[in-house]
Amino acid sequence: MALAGLTLFLSPVAQAQDNALPDFGEGNAVPLSQEYYLGRAWLMQFRRQAPILSDPQLQDYTERLIYDLALTSQLRERRLEVVLVNNRTINAFAVPGGVVGVHNGLILAAGNEAQLASVLGHELAHLSQRHFARG
């Protein structure tokens, strides 16, 4: 009985130590060499159309948080561009080439830095796993 309880207790601990993301194979819809340029072209267009939030302090804070997270991520390319969107919805997104968009609604809704970091880490995982390049 005690052994069964110990097994149940240790199982989540062992699972938590294995933090590798699943590998669904290489994306081939967009070559890695073109991602950066596609992302920057998309970003130029996006900035012309979307309500961009211009807040230097918030920009610096968000960039610092994302760059800190990127240090321990599986990203091959760490040239990241953070764009703050003036939108009250709770949302963030990732675009090829290291573009991460963050709605100010997400920042306002986050109860603390850890909650915001978890969403930003999720977006970095989209980039590292190249989900957009899978067609």
Regions found by a protein language model. Give the residues of each.
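Peri-catalytic and regulatory segments of divalent metal-dependent proteins
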Residues: 16-135
